[in-house]
Amino acid sequence: MKILVDENMPYARDLFSRLGEVTAVPGRPIPVAQLADADALMVRSVTKVNESLLAGKPIKFVGTATAGTDHVDEAWLKQAGIGFSAAPGCNAIAVVEYVFSSLLMLAERDGFSLHERTVGIVGVGNVGRRLQARLEALGIKTLLCDPPRADRGDEGDFRSLDELVQHADILTFHTPLFKDGPYKTLHLADEKLIRSLKPGAILINACRGAVVDNTALLTCLSEGQKLSVVLDVWEGEPELNVELLKKVDIGTPHIAGYTLEGKARGTTQVFEAYSKFIGHEQHVALDTLLPAPEFGRITLHGPLDQPTLKRLVHLVYDVRRDDAPLRKVAGIPGEFDKLRKNYLERREWSSLYVICDDASAASLLCKLGFNAVHHPAR
């Protein structure tokens, strides 16, 4: 059995070798010749999986180690009798922590408290729900918009997008990309929406590039609209609008979900799905794969305020480390993908063991996802 895996899927070679012969290949572009005798294909979001790629090939199963699936023609796979699995929620924690890293940087730079801001969350799936929970643990007001879930009667106080635009100081997008249909998200943030944002608002897109109309956004910023922007995703990736990058406050190369834990979850989820597909079901404990974190433990004295939280968050991950490299190479062919391929190891907050002498600080840090314990001072 021959299994092709994206060369940037951590632990894929070791795991899938339990099931067959493994060949690691680049994800963009996939070397088509390798598909001629392969039984399974494991990809990431950079690989477009459709009829033109797989028609006439012996592939029986496709797995994507990503939460999103808009790069996969699921309808055609089903029609062709090809098994499929994604990894929903695998990188949700990573994306939430990316948003926090960005907001805490902007708050420090611009001198505001997040408690003074209302956060509008557009898309309340795996990422949106986790973001809401962590923000509300800090006492930060959130407004939720998710028409599909609202129409299904899902639990939640869902508002219209217009209401979020009117009342939110921070608007962050966490939707799939739907190019048509009743819940279309292509250019959901169009020129009208962008111009309607509150003066000084913060706009964040860490889902799919085309959810925000990049041309309209550049127009508004070029005309001097007072708006802070965080973009991790771009229309036309791996190409991006260099002029837009110059205007945004934080720009990164589609790496919001790129924690080691998130990647490992994605790999293990599709590995477990494929093992079940072929009748040799196996399960993997994530902590058996991950290395020891860079920082073993730290001690925190006193209560948890915003500056202290910012220091802890940026000790684990400071978004500026990914902004600067992109600005240096933007516009050079191939460099966007190279930044992603050679991405520095990044961990999640849970990797940081925090010893607190303040019980409320320990409790709050645990709610936020840190590995915190209370040890009273002696």
UniProtKB/Swiss-Prot annotation:
TM region positions: none
InterPro entries: D-isomer_2_OHA_DH_cat_dom, D-isomer_DH_CS, D-isomer_DH_CS1, D-isomer_DH_NAD-bd, Erythronate-4-P_DHase, Erythronate-4-P_DHase_dimer, NAD(P)-bd_dom_sf, PdxB_dimer_sf
Coiled-coil blocks: none
Superkingdom to which the source organism belongs: Bacteria
Name of the top EC class for this enzyme: oxidoreductase
Active site (catalytic residues): R208, E237, H254
S-S bridge residues: none
Keyword terms, alphabetized: Cytoplasm, NAD, Oxidoreductase, Pyridoxine biosynthesis
Pathway(s) this gene product operates in, as recorded in its UniProt entry: Cofactor biosynthesis; pyridoxine 5'-phosphate biosynthesis; pyridoxine 5'-phosphate from D-erythrose 4-phosphate: step 2/5
GO cellular component terms listed in the entry, alphabetical order: cytosol
EC number: 1.1.1.290
Chain positions recorded as substrate binding sites: S45, T66, Y258
Signal peptide range: none
Chief place where the protein resides: cytoplasm
Location in or out of the cell: Cytoplasm
Quaternary structure and partners: Homodimer.
Role this protein plays: Catalyzes the oxidation of erythronate-4-phosphate to 3-hydroxy-2-oxo-4-phosphonooxybutanoate.
Protein name as it appears in the record: Erythronate-4-phosphate dehydrogenase
Organism of this sequence: Escherichia coli O1:K1 / APEC
